[in-house]
């Protein structure tokens, strides 16, 4: 991959971190409300 520098590394980490937190939050909320048992 060519490092063009158009996207800051901290921005990629921030978006990735928010995505992981959102997925974990939805999974915990789904399992807490009983919807996670159907997955």
From Swiss-Prot:
Keywords recorded for this protein, A-Z: Chloroplast, Membrane, Photosynthesis, Photosystem II, Plastid, Reaction center, Thylakoid, Transmembrane, Transmembrane helix
Gene Ontology CC: chloroplast thylakoid membrane; photosystem II reaction center
Top-level division of the source organism's lineage: Eukaryota
Transmembrane segments: 9-29
Membrane topology listed for this record: Single-pass membrane protein
Cellular localisation: Plastid, Chloroplast thylakoid membrane
Gene3D superfamilies linked: 6.10.250.2070
Signal peptide: none
GO biological process, one term: photosynthesis
Pfam families xref list: PsbJ
Family under the similarity heading: Belongs to the PsbJ family.
Annotated function: One of the components of the core complex of photosystem II (PSII). PSII is a light-driven water:plastoquinone oxidoreductase that uses light energy to abstract electrons from H(2)O, generating O(2) and a proton gradient subsequently used for ATP formation. It consists of a core antenna complex that captures photons, and an electron transfer chain that converts photonic excitation into a charge separation.
Subunit structure: PSII is composed of 1 copy each of membrane proteins PsbA, PsbB, PsbC, PsbD, PsbE, PsbF, PsbH, PsbI, PsbJ, PsbK, PsbL, PsbM, PsbT, PsbX, PsbY, PsbZ, Psb30/Ycf12, at least 3 peripheral proteins of the oxygen-evolving complex and a large number of cofactors. It forms dimeric complexes.
Name of the protein: Photosystem II reaction center protein J
Species for this entry: Phaeodactylum tricornutum (strain CCAP 1055/1)
The encoding gene: psbJ
């Amino acid at each position: 991959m060519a490092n063009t520098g158009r996207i800051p590394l901290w921005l990629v980490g921030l978006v990735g971190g928010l995505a992981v937190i959102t997925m974990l939050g939805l999974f915990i909320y789904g399992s807490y409300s009983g919807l996670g048992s159907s997955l």
